[in-house]
A protein has these predicted regions:
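Acidic/histidine-enriched alpha-helical segments
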Residues: 1, 31, 127-139, 195-198, ...
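Small/polar-residue-rich segments within soluble enzyme cores
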Residues: 1-98, 411-412, 429
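Soluble non-cytosolic domains of exported or imported proteins
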Residues: 3-4, 34, 54-58, 96, ...
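Short, well-structured beta-strand/strand-turn elements
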Residues: 17-26, 124, 194, 260, ...
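Beta-lactam-recognizing serine transpeptidase/beta-lactamase-like catalytic domain environment
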Residues: 79-93, 130-172, 178-416
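Conserved, well-ordered alpha-helix/loop/beta-strand core segments that scaffold catalytic motifs
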Residues: 86-130
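Acidic/histidine-rich, surface-exposed loop or edge segments in extracytoplasmic proteins
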Residues: 92-102, 331-332, 499-510
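Ligand-recognition elements built from short beta-strands and adjacent flexible loops
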Residues: 271, 412-416, 433-563
Length: 563
């Protein structure tokens, strides 16, 4: 039982007689409850404090444990008859101090979209692991972050590690953006320069190919759009006499350093210096296409977000503010790591190339309706330590949307896909699903806001049809009834000409949608389906912890956020 339920129970007959006469003995225990299940589980994290030993601090909870845990109290206790203890009031007593509340930037609905899209693709590809991150372009606040790994014992995917934060690997072709940024900024090339994409590029006794394709002579812009490895030749020809100039250009962006994330475990980026003993004649061309260096998915996303954000490199953040009672203790503002990663002209060139990748290049399979996506595909072999490169691949797509006035940046990385290895197919399709659903949701919000601002009739709750019709007749509101004659539950939409009502369908075996309903109607429907309802707040239902349409399990708890 919850604490409020126990207090109500104590007032019942017999139970109100106390411990000895009524037999009501309450045993208290603390239980960690996750109303949203496994959503963002690793990023939300946990904290385990062991006296005399090193504490285990994971994710947001681990990072902000000093705020969350509060302070323990202290009280003198006296042992009395029956092996019981009673408190003794004295000046040594110290009242415990409750912890603060940490408000994250993660949007539950967007998190569900990202996690569902990633999980579906990992299952389809029978991949080893993957991650997807969605971030606000203008602020750097992370709105969704999904990390899934395959468990060979249970044959299911779960959140075991924060790959987006901690997995530093060779990014592959998504790094070509950084390579051309440096070459453009240092005046070595223009995107209109002509290059010959022969399909094979030799460096000493090694070579790179375009996967059997020959694109012929065209511009650097087209080479980027096609993800041709002629870019390795371009970088090599311009920097072979002074490789450190190229490396210094990368360091000026800031991608050689950690982002300084609030949560622990950020992977260390690795950009090889020209003085490194392992720097060989082929290091420069290999680096230019994302090998012989390492970056985490979140570090790559920060770079692409900077392009979308007019050159401003932001620190990704997970917490908006910390609150104690009604007082905000700490408010987190966007944090700038680099005010300008490049000039305006270079920025415009980069944007044009990223848009071209989706419009005409390797990611033309993810073109969206109603808005444009900009981004870059990446496919790289995964190094197997001393064994070299085997047949394991990493597929990725990083970009932002909409291409004009971007709202969100996003990266999807999948390791060990078995059916397809290309970033456009494996990760690009996940990116597109996230972008489509997020954009539709944001566009819907904007439309509703405009519509509501010009309506002359009041907002109406979703819920019981008969109750709604009685109320609307009493106050004289015109109703456009588009629902079926037999339906009990309706959705409403307020307009200039009155209120339109339609049938609210609840499919058997799936969690119903009760958002927009009053608590009484919502509770009636959910309990009818066998769910245990826990309301939080007052007003109408704004959020439900189990998304509508998910498979229903009787006895499962669902939290309703009211407002």
């Amino acid at each position: 039982l919850r604490n409020d339920e126990v207090e109500r129970l104590k007032k019942f007959p017999i139970f109100n007689l106390g411990k000895y006469k009524g037999g009501c003995i309450v045993l208290k225990s603390n239980k960690r409850v996750k109303p949203y299940g496994m959503l963002a589980n690793r990023t939300v994290g946990y904290a385990v404090e062991n006296e005399g030993k090193k504490s285990i601090l994971v994710g947001i909870e681990g990072a902000f444990n000093t705020y969350l845990k509060g302070q323990n109290g202290q009280m003198l206790m006296e042992k009395i008859r029956g092996n019981e203890w009673k408190p003794v009031e004295n000046e040594l007593s110290v009242e415990p101090v409750p912890g603060s509340d940490v408000y994250t930037s993660i949007d539950v609905n967007l998190q569900d979209v990202a996690e569902s899209a990633l999980l579906k693709q990992l299952k389809d590809q029978k991949a080893q692991k993957g991650c997807a991150v969605l971030m606000e372009v203008k602020t750097g606040f992370v709105k969704a972050i999904a990390n899934l790994s395959f468990d060979t014992e249970t044959e299911t995917y779960f959140e075991a590690q924060n790959h987006a934060v901690g997995l530093a690997s060779e990014p592959g072709s998504t790094f070509k953006l950084a390579s051309l940024l440096v070459a453009l900024e240092q005046g070595k090339v223009k995107i209109t320069d002509s290059v010959d994409m022969t399909g094979r590029y030799d460096f000493y006794d090694n070579y790179l190919t375009d996967g059997g394709k020959v694109y012929g002579r065209n511009t650097i812009k087209v080479a980027f759009e096609k993800s041709s490895n002629v870019i390795s030749q371009i970088i090599y020809d311009n920097y072979k006499k002074d490789p450190q100039e190229f490396i210094d250009g990368l360091k000026e962006i800031g991608i050689h350093q950690k982002l300084g994330l609030s949560i622990l475990g950020e992977g260390t980026p690795f950009i090889k210096e020209s003085t490194d003993p392992t720097f060989t004649g082929i290091t420069l061309p290999w680096m230019s296409i994302g090998y012989e260096l390492k970056m985490t998915p979140l570090q790559t996303l920060a770079l692409y977000n900077a392009v979308a954000n007019e050159g401003i490199l932001l620190k990704p953040q997970f917490v908006r503010y910390i609150k104690k009672g009604s007082e905000i203790q700490k408010y987190f503002k966007p944090e700038i790591l680099n005010t300008s990663i490049c000039s305006k002209s270079t920025l415009n060139d980069l944007k044009a190339m990223l848009e071209g990748v989706v419009e005409r290049g390797t990611a033309n399979n993810i073109k969206a309706r109603g808005f444009k996506i900009a981004g870059k595909t990446g496919t790289s072999k995964i190094a197997q330590g001393s064994k070299g490169y085997g047949n394991k691949y990493q597929a990725s797509f990083c970009g932002y949307f909409p291409a004009k006035n971007p709202m969100y940046s996003c990266i999807v990385v999948v390791q060990g896909p078995t059916k397809n290895i290309f970033g456009s197919v494996v990760s690009g399709s996940v990116f597109k699903e996230i972008a489509d659903k997020v954009y539709a949701q944001e566009f819907k919000k904007e439309n509703i806001a405009v519509e509501d601002s010009i309506n002359q009739y009041p907002y109406s709750r979703n819920g019981d049809k008969e109750s709604f019709l009685i109320a609307s007749r009493k106050i004289g509101i015109p109703v456009n009834d588009l629902s079926s004659n037999t339906t009990q539950w309706i959705s409403t939409r307020t307009g200039n000409n009155g209120i339109k009502i339609i049938t609210k369908e609840n499919k058997k075996g799936l969690v119903p949608n009760v958002i927009g309903m009053g608590l009484i109607d919502a509770t009636y429907i959910l309990e009818k389906y066998g769910l245990l309802v826990q309301p939080v707040g007052s007003g109408i239902v704004r959020e439900q912890s189990i998304r509508a349409g998910f498979k229903l399990y009787k006895g499962q708890k669902i939290v309703l956020q009211l407002g």
